[in-house]
Amino acid sequence: AGQKPNPRTSDEQFLRRAYLAIVGRIPTIAETQAFLGSSADGKRDVLVERLLASEGRVLHEYAFWADLLRVQTRLADRYPGQNYIAWIKQSLRENKPYDTFVRELVTAQGPLLQRGNGATGFYIRDAGMPLDHMATVAQIFLGTQIGCAQCHDHPFDSLTRKQFYQFAAYTHGADSAKDLLGGKELRQRMKDKELPVEVKKMLQQFSNSVAMRVK
């Protein structure tokens, strides 16, 4: 009570703050001149809507999620991660609700390289490490550290070692190596040249890598 609101920001202040908050950069000279030179009513609302609809907003938010989800261009040091990256960016582009975004990640299944199925990269990222993956999931989405419960009951929480393994059992059946390429259907599409050039290139690189390991 008795507190007064801050005075209205100047156009210069608003412009800078809007760009930094929404797209993660300061405005260019041209953008600054265009905004400050406009006398249109509601130009601030128009600016915000334009920035929210821009690819810059997608890339700025992606930087946050890429860090949180530990995204890599090569998952588990051998699988191409571009499909996973594209899925995250498209989810942000569509302004996908948070609960839907998380649900699609934790319930992802199917071949990693299948078009539109990039959410499976969430599991491929920690291929062969189901316990570490579960600890990371809890840290990201529950905001709590449970990794110590892999070996013993949590010393500062009620979580037991048994409960940790019950959590981990949720993804026990996930096989990151099985049917990575989507089986016969995807290989046939590759043969019939129905896949984008960049996807075929990634598949070829993966096949070459496997061949080298076999030799």
Name each model-derived stretch:
Residues 1-208, 212-215:
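Short, structured secondary-structure elements
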